[in-house]
Every structure is written in structure tokens, then in C-alpha cells.
């Protein structure tokens, strides 16, 4: 799944409008709609803001994993041993 679908799904799953998310990001609803359609690439600052807003990892939004939250650092270190 690509980030276009993920950002739409996250927004819809939390019952937010495009306008609400656009206001949070400090952009227009029109521009945010373009992100959701894939007509414009989303700036990294907006990706980071959405990760914080939805409490998910960038890897999840970008489609690299289906795990929404990153592993706690204590678990990452225990797997390296």
C-alpha cells in the first residue's frame, strides 16, 4: 500500500475531514486533497506532522510496514544481541 492510500485511510478511520487535517498541517484543503490523490508529493515536514498526529511510524505511512507503531527502543536493542 502506498502513502496516498495510507493517509486517506488514517484520516477516514479517525473521522476527520480533509479541511481539519489541512488546518493542522497549515495548508489548504485543496493542497491536502492533492496529496491524497497523489497529484502532489507531500513535504517531509507534513509526513512528520502526520506521524505525530496519528501516532504511527513513517514506515507505516510510506507503506514499508503494516505495523503502525515502531518497536520501543528497548525491544530493538534486545533483538540485536
Residue ranges of each PLM-predicted region?
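A detector for short, charged/polar N-terminal pre-domain segments
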Residues: 1-5, 69-71
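DNA major-groove recognition helix of helix-turn-helix
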Residues: 36, 54, 65
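Short basic helix-loop element that most often maps to the first helix and adjoining turn
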Residues: 5-24, 49
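DNA major-groove recognition helix of helix-turn-helix/homeodomain DNA-binding modules
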Residues: 26, 45-60
Amino acid at each position: 500500500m502506498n502513502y496516498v492510500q495510507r493517509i486517506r485511510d488514517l484520516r477516514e478511520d479517525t473521522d476527520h475531514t480533509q479541511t481539519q487535517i489541512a488546518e493542522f498541517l497549515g495548508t489548504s484543503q485543496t493542497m491536502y486533497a492533492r496529496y491524497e490523490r497523489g497529484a502532489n508529493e507531500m513535504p517531509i515536514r507534513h509526513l512528520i506532522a502526520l506521524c505525530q498526529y496519528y501516532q504511527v511510524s513513517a514506515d507505516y505511512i510510506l507503506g514499508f510496514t503494516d505495523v503502525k507503531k515502531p518497536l520501543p527502543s528497548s525491544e530493538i536493542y534486545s533483538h540485536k544481541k
